UniProtKB/Swiss-Prot annotation:
The lineage of its organism: Bacteria, Pseudomonadati, Thermodesulfobacteriota, Desulfobulbia, Desulfobulbales. It comes from Desulfotalea psychrophila (strain LSv54 / DSM 12343). Signal peptide: none annotated. It is a peripheral membrane protein. It is found in: Cell inner membrane. This is ATP synthase epsilon chain. One of its GO terms (molecular function) is proton-transporting ATP synthase activity, rotational mechanism.
Amino acid sequence: MAQQINLEVVTPSGSIINKDVDIVNAPGSGGDFGVLANHAPLLSTIKIGALTYEIGEERNTLMVSGGFCEVSNNKITFLVESAEAKQDIDTDRAMKAKIRAEKRIAKHGLPSDEAYSDTRAEAALHRALIRLRVAQGL
């Protein structure tokens, strides 16, 4: 059996995952990256996206929100705002959030003081699209 790296995903609610895995692929703010056993130490910010990990032939996917990642001593730890396993994502809710966000973005002639609201709508749309992508296994 190949060497493994310990993966831990922590949210404000507590530890979501703590297991040995073969490989981790993460959505870093500077681009996606992969980590295997014995990886060099690394710190990275994490953006909203799909975090995947493999154990043997089994591939698992989580939707993670923003946070941080540390690789050290054959362990990779993610501290993220939220994490949802593929099977836990409510696709109906995600689709409704996508539609709401698209409607907010589609409004024209927003006053300048609503620019913040528009940015929030874009972030909500991005989260909904990632949830749907993870739920559909893409």
